[in-house]
From Swiss-Prot:
The gene is dxr. This is 1-deoxy-D-xylulose 5-phosphate reductoisomerase. Its EC number is 1.1.1.267. Keywords: Isoprene biosynthesis, Manganese, Metal-binding, NADP, Oxidoreductase. Its cofactor is Mg(2+); Mn(2+). It comes from the Bacteria. It comes from Janthinobacterium sp. (strain Marseille).
Length: 390
């Protein structure tokens, strides 16, 4: 029986993970669930899955959760804050950790899980974007297993033999191709993009996701973050990581080899597929996702992304090339910009402009430890906030 900690259990990936776990009660049980502020939803999850521990973001939320659990006669231990998150991520009772907290908040517990030698199911791409060398060093030192959950990276993982994933160029890999739907504004007149509302931006044509990642998809910053993530996961330089727009979202990514072969992973756009793969690897289990019907789909199309339409993608490539703290700076500025857009404080096209301005002002420095990462993150956030009109 595998004991699972789910960091971010009330988010879309967390909910999908619980759906897969519920289908296999003979294989998996829940050790801990965490949420920032969705206390009622977390209490419902605790009632169903009966974790040993539940963690929330604040003391106030913890008190509220405790009342709800007591009313149901549940004996789940309640904690709050970053230290409690790190504790459930590294607990000896836990075998695997689903790292699904969105943004920089997920970095510390993800690192704690890696340092403790867990099987880390990585849905929090920001952990690698902000501190790629630190996380990969922790995995190597502890013997942790890092399983990508993003559908694109999970697809690459499935298309590349395990024996060559850390040295792909030496094993005949020419490049990897990360597919992107193009989001809701792929065909919209570029000159009208500053007029779009956040409600339009979060209406993804293929995937059901949270608001922040949906906006990232609309700007293609999400794909930019995935380029940086792929660099660390598969040890490939930026020029060997190509982004291809694929509106049908059926081909999740591809690996091109020097002999002319291209291997692709196909499937319906449902996060339960990569979650089930990562939970059971190297075995296979049912995810609840039906197989694709290629006859019904009939056509698959691909095109190159336009950096004029998607400047955030170019910013991510620039950050990867700059190295050091540049990706962390970019990520912090993006989180501030996206939240400002969701709060209707800036327009859609101001997102990339704000990020570029922060990246221009803040020089990249070496990343030596988690404290230096957080210092750069804080500075970039303060700078980004100072650029937003009051």
């Amino acid at each position: 029986m595998q004991q699972i900690t789910i960091l971010g259990s009330t988010g879309s990936v967390g909910v999908s993970t619980l759906d897969v776990i519920a289908r296999h009660p003979d294989r998996y049980s829940v050790y801990a669930l965490t949420a920032q502020s969705k206390v009622e939803e977390l209490a419902q999850q605790c009632a169903r899955f009966k974790p040993q521990v539940a963690v929330v973001g604040s003391a106030e939320a913890a008190k509220k959760l405790q009342v709800l659990l007591d009313a149901q006669g549940l004996h789940t231990q309640v904690g709050y804050g970053e230290a409690a998150l790190c504790a459930v991520a590294s607990a000896p009772e836990c075998d695997s950790v689903m790292a699904a907290i969105v943004g920089a908040a997920g970095l510390a517990p993800t690192l704690a899980a890696a340092r403790s030698g867990k099987r880390v199911l990585l849905a929090n791409k920001e952990a690698l974007v902000m501190s790629g060398p630190l996380l990969m060093e922790a995995v190597a030192a502890s013997g942790a297993i890092l399983m990508p959950i993003d559908s694109e990276h999970n697809a690459i993982f499935q298309c590349m033999p395990a024996t060559c994933q850390r040295t792909p160029l030496a094993h005949g890999v020419e490049k990897i191709l990360l597919t992107a739907s193009g989001g809701p504004f792929l065909k919209r007149d570029v000159n009208t993009l500053d007029q779009v509302s956040w409600q339009e931006a979060v209406a993804h044509p293929k995937w059901v996701m949270g608001r922040k990642i949906s906006v990232d998809s609309a700007t293609m910053m999400n794909k930019g973050l995935e380029v940086i993530e792929a660099h660390w996961l598969f040890d490939l330089p930026a020029e060997r990581i190509e982004v291809v727009i694929h509106p049908q979202s059926v081909v999740h990514s591809m690996v091109s080899y020097v002999d002319g072969s291209v291997l692709a992973q196909l499937g319906n756009p449902d996060m339960r597929t990569p979650i089930a793969h990562a939970l059971a690897y190297p075995e296979r289990i049912s995810s609840g996702v039906p197989p694709i019907d290629l006859i019904q789909i009939a056509q698959l199309s691909f095109e190159r992304p336009d950096f004029l339409r998607f400047p955030c993608l170019k910013l991510a490539y620039d950050a990867l090339q700059a190295g050091g703290s540049a990706p962390a700076i970019m990520n912090a500025a993006n989180e501030i910009a996206v939240q400002a857009f969701l709060d209707s404080r800036i327009g859609f096209r101001a997102i990339d402009q704000l990020i570029a301005r922060v990246m221009d002002v803040m020089p990249s420095v070496a990343i030596t430890d988690i404290e230096s990462v957080f210092a750069q993150d804080r500075c970039a956030r303060e700078l980004a906030n100072s650029f937003i009109p009051s």
